[in-house]
A protein has these predicted regions:
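Charge-rich, low-complexity N-terminal segments
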Residues: 1-65, 102
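Mixed-charge, glycine-accented linear interaction segment located at domain edges/termini
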Residues: 134-151
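A generic structural signal for beta-strand entry/edge sites
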Residues: 45-47, 65-69, 114-118
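Short, internal acidic amphipathic alpha-helical interface segments
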Residues: 71-122
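Charged/polar, solvent-exposed surface patches and flexible loops
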Residues: 18, 22-26, 88-92, 137, ...
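A short acidic/glycine-rich loop-to-helix N-cap element
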Residues: 125-137
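Short, flexible helical or helix-coil boundary motifs
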Residues: 27, 31, 90, 94-97, ...
Length: 151
């Protein structure tokens, strides 16, 4: 059975939006984010505003799509190729497990539209907590360690 087929047939955890919201609130409480608010929330979707690394960004969560998507994190796409390669490296078995995104649990991708770079993580096997935390860790690594290389 393919991973897509098994993903669809697995029942969703209850209060998935609440779980993701609590994780993000935890990052705000611990000072990772300078600001955090829930803009809109239903049982199936949520939209958050996060102030982080001198930026205000939106994070969109869709339970049915099993995705979390950061709105514009980076603009000035001159380094899009390098950023795409870096995002792929985040899945590499060469990285230590605590710094790696396990492709059997989540898949991070970056997209370029209208001069801006967006990041989306797709949840696999309903591991929403893992995917949420890995998205935040990856974005943090990109913003702190890598961004100056691409400016």
């Amino acid at each position: 059975m393919s991973s897509t087929r098994s993903r669809v047939s697995e029942p969703l955890p209850t209060d998935t939006v609440g779980l993701v919201t609590r994780i993000l609130e935890g990052y705000a409480t611990n000072g990772v984010f300078r600001g955090f608010s829930v803009i809109a929330q239903t049982k199936a979707t949520a939209k958050y505003r996060i102030v982080w690394h001198e930026r205000t960004c939106e994070l969109l969560f869709s339970v049915s799509r099993r995705t979390l998507r950061f709105g514009t994190i980076l603009s000035d796409s001159s380094g899009i190729k390098e950023i795409s390669n870096f995002v792929e490296l985040l899945h590499s078995s060469e990285r230590p497990p605590h710094r790696r995104i396990d492709p059997a649990r989540a898949r991070l991708r970056c997209f370029y539209r209208g001069g801006n770079i967006f990041f989306t993580i797709t949840v696999i096997r309903n591991d929403f907590e893992y995917a949420t935390r890995k998205l935040i860790h990856a974005a943090n690594e990109i913003l702190i360690d890598a961004e100056p290389k691409w400016k």
